[in-house]
Structures are given as structure tokens and as C-alpha cells.
A protein has these predicted regions:
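Extracellular beta-sheet/turn segments enriched in Thr/Pro/Gly and aliphatic residues
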Residues: 49-77, 206-210
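Glycine-rich phosphate/pyrophosphate-binding loop
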Residues: 302-361
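Non-catalytic, glycine-rich low-complexity segments
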Residues: 79-107, 190-236, 309, 313-326, ...
Length: 412
């Protein structure tokens, strides 16, 4: 049979369920001849590689890496495709995993199956023909009571999933376990690997942390002129605050930044207190975290998800104190905010900051499409004033959050 490389990455595979139960040997040959062949250990002209098929109908997958000549073979039940890059299982609480019933072989009772939880802080979990390798593991047990009704009401997408319980000792370690790679494997009564998958953890993270984490204030907040920086990153292994002076070049390298290691709290948040001189400083978080997208621990530089100010094109967050009078328009001090007797008295006009003035030729070109247009006496503002005289009392700005993918430099 031909091994194929459909995605062109240099890894050739072939799978079949047609090999009867028994013991076999194989090797890989190039060009339909034995002139160039590879066997055990990837050695040229190496020994045949032995493997066993435990029963008829088992899927056998052969893999050959062209660059290294490494060869492997694994077996699994028909219909199952162990793949840790997928995430079919859900961690829904520190002691509970949801497994899709559709992934259980037809006609097999879940009581007769066996599951294991695997984890590694550094990643590197892999699947061979027998099990998930690397890291630590714990046995899971099937709970015939199923998933809690309250969970299913909140997450109807989990209907049809079976409940797997995590041992108490492992459950206590779950916040630390979630800082690395996580996988669940399923085996039959003989110990044959049937399936293996990665794990989605968002529901479990909410279950463990959301109540206490919601009591925190995130972003940067000032008290007695001192800023406190806080970010929620429960799966991070380390978080460091990087700061650059106020008004500094947003393109300044990270090597020029001041660094402050942040402290983790039990609710998944990280925080650090800064000095008054950090007012209006540019900053980023350096986050060390396991990334399922790459299968490795990565170091990422990210802006603050709770930013109240950012530099051009969102390259850096800015530590702005919103209570600072310097950011208050002078007119606000002498203009009382109108009060309505009841919300139903509102007459609301919705508008988009950009669309309000982007084509208004009665205001300076550099103000068009921006907040500055509201300070001009253009046709847009004259129209709003006319509406106000007619009874309009509320302006609702459509979403004004920062969109990092939109170019902000007018010159571009």
C-alpha cells in the first residue's frame, strides 16, 4: 500500500481496518523497490518492525516521517481517531469531565469502559498504539447519575455527554493542572486504547473561579496616586508587567521596558502595585502559558483586556487614571448632566462615532469620523441641536470599543 502525505508536511500515513488479528512485521520502502528501505529506529536497511492487531476490525495506522525516517504504528477501534489536537471532552468542574456519548463505540456500555485524565505542565503529551504518553495521569470513573441538571440547563450543548468523575486528590490539584496540557483517553476492558482527545476547560474555569474573580477590579486602578495592575489569567504559569515611560515610543522594544513580576491569587487573577511615576505609562503583560494551538508553553506579550486607553493601533495599553481632572473637558465642570424623572422619558438617538461625521465637509478633514467632530459646529451637530429642541434628550453611541485589526493611522 501507498503511504500518503496530503498536506505536504513530510509525514506520510496509511490507515486500514482490513488486517486480521495477529502478529505482523513491516518496513517502509521508497520507489517501489527495496533499494532504499527503512526499518526499526529509522535505520536504512534496518530490521523489520513488529506489531500486533488484537482483533479483527481494528484500525491500524502507519506513519513515516520523510526527514528523519522515523516509523511508527498504532492500533485503535474502528471509528475512533485518537487526536490530542482536538478537544471533544469538557472539564465542567474541578471534579467532573463530560465525555461525548457519540465517541463511545456502538453497543458498548460505558460501565465497561475505562478512562484516564492525562496532564503535563510543559506539554508534550502524545499518543502511541497503547496509551497517552508523557506527563501525569489519574483514573476517571464513570458516574451513571450523569451530568447535573443545573449544568445541562446552563449548557444544553452538553446533552448526550456522559459524566466522568475526577479523584478528590486530583480535583484539588485542578487549578495547577489547568496551567498545562490536558487530555482524556478511553480504553476497552482489555486495555486497548479506543480514543483520546484534548479537553475544553472554559466551563470548568468558570465553575472554579468566576464567583470570586467577579469581585475583583481589572485593568489599572489608582489609589493615593499609586496604580494597581490586575489581569485574570487562570491558566498562565507566570505573568510579568512590562512598562515604558509615559509618552514613550509605542514601538520601543521590550528590552527597554521595566519589569515587575505579578503575584497570582487563588481566583486566577494576577496583580502588582506600581509607583506613582507609572501614571500614563505604556504597558504590556508578558504571559507564560501553555498554548493548545502550538502544543507548547509560549511567552506572549499582550495588551490589557481591561484597557481604558491604548496607543495607536493598540500596540500598548496606557495606565490612565479616569478620575484625573486632566482628562475632563473644561465644559463638563460647568455643564450639569441632565436628569430624567424616569427611563421611559428617554427619547433616544443612536449614532456611530465614525459615520456621524466621516463625510461631513463642514468640519476640518482631520476631525471627520472622530470624537473631535462633536466639538465642531458642523451640519451634524446643528442637526443634533435641532433634534434636542424638538425633544430629543438622549444620544446612544453605538459600540466604541477598540478593534485592534482596524488601521488607526490616518496617513495609512
Amino acid at each position: 500500500p501507498w503511504l500518503q502525505d496530503p498536506d505536504g508536511d513530510g509525514t506520510f500515513t496509511w490507515s486500514t481496518a482490513s488486517i486480521p488479528a495477529g502478529n505482523y512485521e513491516f518496513k517502509v520502502a521508497h520507489g517501489l523497490s527495496w533499494a532504499e528501505n527503512y526499518g526499526a529506529g529509522g535505520a536504512r536497511d534496518g530490521a523489520n518492525i513488529g506489531f500486533s492487531v488484537p482483533s479483527d476490525g481494528v484500525v491500524v495506522t502507519f506513519t513515516y516521517v520523510l526527514a528523519t525516517h522515523q516509523i511508527s504504528v498504532k492500533t485503535s477501534k474502528a471509528g475512533a481517531t485518537p487526536d490530542l489536537t482536538k478537544a471533544k471532552a469538557f472539564l465542567v468542574a474541578r471534579d467532573l469531565v463530560a465525555w461525548p456519548a457519540a465517541a463511545i463505540p456502538a453497543g458498548v456500555q460505558p460501565e465497561l469502559l475505562h478512562w484516564r485524565l492525562h496532564w503535563s505542565r510543559t506539554g508534550g503529551l502524545a499518543v502511541d498504539e497503547e496509551t497517552v504518553t508523557g506527563g501525569s495521569l489519574a483514573d476517571l470513573w464513570y458516574d451513571p447519575a450523569g451530568l447535573p441538571s443545573a449544568l445541562l440547563a446552563a449548557h444544553p450543548e452538553l446533552a448526550g455527554y456522559v459524566a466522568l468523575r475526577v479523584p478528590p486528590k486530583t480535583a484539588q490539584q485542578m487549578p495547577a493542572i489547568l496551567k498545562g496540557q490536558l487530555a482524556v483517553a478511553m480504553y476497552d476492558v482489555t486495555g486497548l486504547l479506543l480514543d483520546a482527545t484534548g479537553v475544553q476547560s472554559a466551563i470548568g474555569l468558570d465553575s472554579m473561579f468566576s464567583r470570586s474573580a467577579a469581585q475583583r477590579r481589572y485593568g489599572v486602578h489608582f489609589s493615593d496616586r499609586k496604580p494597581t495592575f490586575r489581569v485574570w489569567a487562570p491558566t498562565a504559569q507566570k505573568v510579568t508587567l512590562l512598562t515604558w515611560p509615559a509618552g514613550s515610543d509605542p514601538a520601543a522594544p521590550s528590552s527597554a521596558a521595566s519589569r515587575r513580576v505579578m503575584t497570582a491569587a487563588d481566583d486566577g487573577s494576577w496583580s502588582v502595585e506600581g509607583a506613582p511615576l507609572l501614571k500614563n505609562a505604556r504597558y504590556l503583560y508578558e504571559v507564560v502559558v501553555y498554548a493548545p494551538s502550538t502544543g507548547k508553553v509560549e511567552t506572549n506579550l499582550v495588551t490589557d483586556p481591561a484597557s481604558v486607553a491604548l496607543t495607536l493601533d493598540s500596540t500598548r495599553s496606557v495606565a490612565v487614571d479616569l478620575a484625573d481632572a486632566a482628562f475632563m473637558p473644561a465644559q463638563w465642570r460647568s455643564t450639569a448632566s441632565p436628569a430624567l424623572r424616569s427611563a421611559v422619558d428617554s427619547t433616544i438617538y443612536e449614532l456611530h462615532v465614525r459615520d456621524f461625521s466621516v463625510n461631513d465637509t463642514t468640519i476640518p478633514a482631520e476631525h471627520r469620523g472622530s470624537y473631535l467632530a462633536f466639538a465642531d459646529d458642523g451640519v451634524g451637530m446643528r442637526h443634533l441641536k435641532a433634534l434636542a429642541r424638538a425633544g430629543l434628550n438622549t444620544v446612544h453611541l453605538l459600540p466604541t470599543f477598540d478593534i485592534a485589526s482596524i488601521e488607526e493611522d490616518p496617513a495609512k
